[in-house]
From Swiss-Prot:
Organism: Mopeia virus (MOPV)
Residues binding Mn(2+), per UniProt: 390, 392, 534
UniProt cross-references to HAMAP family, sorted A to Z: ARENA_NCAP (MF_04085)
Signal peptide location: none
Molecular-function GO term, any one: metal ion binding
One Pfam family hit: Arena_ncap_C
EC numbers for this chain: 3.1.13.-
The protein's name: Nucleoprotein
Residue sites binding Zn(2+) per the record: 400, 507, 510, 530
Residues covered by region (Binding site for the cap structure m7GTP): 54-241
UniProt key word Manganese: yes
Broadest EC class assigned to this enzyme: hydrolase
Amino acid sequence: MSNSKEVKSFLWTQSLRRELSGYCSNIKIQVIKDAQALLHGLDFSEVANVQRLMRKEKRDDSDLKRLRDLNQAVNNLVELKSVQQKNVLRVGTLTSDDLLVLAADLDRLKAKVIRGERPLAAGVYMGNLTAQQLEQRRVLLQMVGMGGGFRAGNTLGDGIVRVWDVRNPELLNNQFGTMPSLTIACMCKQGQADLNDVIQSLSDLGLVYTAKYPNMSDLDKLSQTHPILGIIEPKKSAINISGYNFSLSAAVKAGACLIDGGNMLETIKVTKSNLEGILKAALKVKRSLGMFVSDTPGERNPYENLLYKLCLSGEGWPYIASRTSIVGRAWDNTTVDLSGDVQQNAKPDKGNSNRLAQAQGMPAGLTYSQTMELKDSMLQLDPNAKTWIDIEGRPEDPVEIAIYQPNNGQYIHFYREPTDIKQFKQDSKHSHGIDIQDLFSVQPGLTSAVIESLPKNMVLSCQGADDIRKLLDSQNRRDIKLIDVSMQKDDARKFEDKIWDEYKHLCRMHTGIVTQKKKRGGKEEVTPHCALLDCLMFEAAVIGSPQIPTPRPVLSRDLVFRTGPPRVVL
């Protein structure tokens, strides 16, 4: 957006804020309550999985089901949600001229949205070429002078469109909106930040939003005071955005809700009795400033955004509430009737769940009975079978270890609380994505006990042997031999998505956002590294197929996690 357009757009926003201030409310406490409910009740391993799915270049019905299921879980946990409601606008508060204007604007908005969802501009690919063909296509387009051409909001730099290939596209409706409570919860959990720090950082961003649209330059400056804002990413394609992405727009929306008395549009609450009054006030601003619905595909201007959200959401908070249960689009849920008197009521579904989980102090080390159980369990390993090993963390301070035998599917998988918290947090951001709080309940002493119990002179396969060797040597297991398969990174992880799709339920600890540096600068999100799933994908890479025997755990959950009642060790 050019500077002149941005200034004009913000002028519209400010004018709408002033005119609609009577419909705004202070919802900071409600947003924070919902964020706390999500922190305590949401499965963040599934959040991380959905974030991974949103990075795939093509997604199918199974991916959509995962997204919808997670959205429903979020909806069940929060109180701020919109309720399905059919709105029929009639002559009354709104004049017949008002209704004609609204009907025309809704029709234009419908055409714009649908056209934007199916771009036909040159250089945009919506088909099913392979990755190799797409790369060849990119080179050819550059050769003929199209490399720097059209880059709409739904294309990557190389012209690839990340597309949903689903049987029923209507199931995509209302599944991608951002929610402040969800943004806050994800920043806390996945950014491993204190809730108060996140609230303060977003509040400062919201204060900037009272005067201008914050941009990435503003964000960089704020990040110097609030490091957690560094988790926010540069602008993403609209087709790839979801409520679980750390976009600037999501953060700004969250910040707007934390400003008491800011008259932010994001805090408007719609009821059946005030909808027409809100629309009447919006039309007043439209006429005074000459606001309009643009024919140009792309982001909605403030008037378009307000109109769409008001007509879609029914009863609730059109900007910030969960709307995953809303069916249809704005033009489906709001109609204009100059003579009819149709009304439909919907009862709100009030649901709330608060599940708290916290680690409690327990005796350190394995008990005698646990040691005996471990030795018996280790007998399930075949000392002569092919065996993979992988670790996450540093060899002197590992946090996750996995041992896997593909012939019979047996695996050992456990975790360890780190001693170097600072290094752990760095590794979490750039490798494994584990939250330190999730490791407080793991069984201490298991690393040494398991390595000590491995069969003598055993041979282990690994992808990179240096760290594994250091770990084994530190436990005086120099008798164990290592085979470093030394695959290229891309080759080793070519079945990564298929393995995660099939076996993600085996490990729910990798909840954070993991980023790695690009060769040409900047950073990108990647799938977290899980020691167990890495072993599975390495085996799949070696045999050339993700079809592997069903993995079966050797260790019981009681061995991996402390489950007994707390007691004081004297």
